[in-house]
A protein has these predicted regions:
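N-terminal presequence-like segments and the immediate start of the first folded domain
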Residues: 1-21, 138-142
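Glycine-rich phosphate/diphosphate-binding loop of Rossmann-like nucleotide-binding domains
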Residues: 12-60
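Solvent-exposed alpha-helices and their adjacent loops that cap or buttress functional pockets
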Residues: 13-18, 76, 110-114
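Structural motif
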Residues: 23, 56, 65, 80-82, ...
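Short, ordered loop/turn segments at secondary-structure junctions
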Residues: 29, 87-88, 123-127
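Amphipathic alpha-helical hairpins
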Residues: 40, 46-50, 54-77, 94, ...
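Glycine-rich phosphate-binding loop
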Residues: 65-107
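C-terminal binding/interaction regions
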Residues: 96-97, 101-145
Length: 145
């Protein structure tokens, strides 16, 4: 479990993103969390030289649908990378496990099948507070990382 703020980066060691096109697929579920992660990702891409018109964002209903959204992006757009953004919070049932396992394996499968990398930015936390802490709270914004 991440317990330090890793949301700081050194732009001098990151390639300039000026000539790259990025896709972002973001889950609408827990949108207070996912929108903060998306904001962090977009601000970081812009800070690293990407232009706003080269950042394409799509929304899907939940984290489980991130795989579908990423696959559609891969098949319809020419992109250099895709960021999958979601948030799953542990509840009282096994639903958490099924969603987390499904989206993780789905993103792995897409990374193996396609040559465009998909970055996994899905918070899988035990509580809403942990998600808040990692989407702009005391542990930074994992969308930046």
């Amino acid at each position: 479990m991440a317990t330090t703020n890793l949301s700081h980066y050194d732009k001098t060691i990151i390639p300039n993103a000026k000539d790259f096109r990025f896709g972002i697929v973001v889950s609408e579920w827990n949108s207070d969390i996912t929108k903060n992660l998306q904001k962090g990702a977009i601000e970081t891409l812009l800070d690293c030289g990407a232009s706003q018109e080269n950042i394409i964002s799509w929304e899907v209903p939940g984290s489980f649908e991130l795989v579908y959204g990423c696959k559609k992006m891969l098949e319809t757009l020419q992109l250099d990378a895709i960021i999958a953004i979601g948030n799953v919070i542990q509840g009282e049932t096994k639903h958490f496990d099924f969603v987390c396992n499904g989206v993780t394996q789905g993103i792995v499968d897409l990374n193996v099948k396609y040559s465009t990398p998909i970055i996994f930015c899905v918070l899988t936390d035990n509580s809403k507070q942990q998600s808040i802490d990692r989407s702009g709270g005391k542990f930074g914004n994992k969308g930046i990382e």
